[in-house]
Amino acid sequence: MMKKFAVVALVASFGLTACQTQDPYTGEQKTSKATYGALGGAVIGALGGALIGGGDSTDRRQRAMIGAGVGALAGGGIGYYMDKQEAELTQRLRSSGVSVTRVGNDIILNMPGNVTFATDSSDINAKFYDVLNSVAIVLKEYDKTLIDVTGHTDSTGSDQYNLELSQKRAQSVAAYLIGQSVDSRRFYIVGAGEAQPIATNDTPQGREQNRRVEIRLSPLTTS
């Protein structure tokens, strides 16, 4: 129960921060009452259907989506569907800093931490909103996929700090996409901390590569 509460609180904070405006005279950050009521409630409610941490239940998500009337993919249609989705993501994300990689029938989006977040923060950089908006458009168009969002860090800092930061970053990205009307029931959200590096942590360049959020898109099937 406490874990779920912490996630909801984080999403509420993210949603309000994302819609704050700056007073041109005082420089103070302000949030309108409409933002509190509309955005905060919508995002919190949407995230309720997502799976947060723990063991991934692909079957549960598959049943939820198929039960909601989303048709499953089968046979040769799987590869064709993912090919089309990959092509559109590649086109929309060109020059964004986000890489699009195909692994079998899955698609992996790698979002580097240095362009997605400020240092030691889970607040998404405002300049990255347009990139996430493009991702959300494709995810809504291709709704026959499950979405795994995993946060990663480098090895600087304690294991616990890195785990918590990676979780918060994954949740921030997922919350933003859900706030753009991507179905929360498709999501599995987890932080891996420093446990899954893709480069050495012995150099600044390697550590920069390891600080990232990955989105894995898997076809919705009945198996």
Residue positions per predicted region:
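Second-shell loop/turn segments in exported
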Residues: G75-G79, T116-I124, D159-N162
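Periplasmic OmpA-like peptidoglycan-binding domain that tethers envelope proteins to the cell wall
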Residues: T150-T222
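Short, low-complexity, glycine-enriched hydrophobic/amphipathic alpha-helices that associate
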Residues: Q22-E88
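Amphipathic, membrane-active segments
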Residues: M82-N114
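Sec-dependent signal peptide recognition
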Residues: K3-A9
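Periplasmic peptidoglycan-binding/anchoring modules of Gram-negative envelope and division proteins
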Residues: R92, T116-G151, I178, E208-N210, ...
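C-terminal motif of bacterial Sec signal peptides marking the signal peptidase cleavage site
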Residues: G15-A18
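Stable alpha-helical elements in mature extracytoplasmic
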Residues: L39, V43, Q85, L89, ...
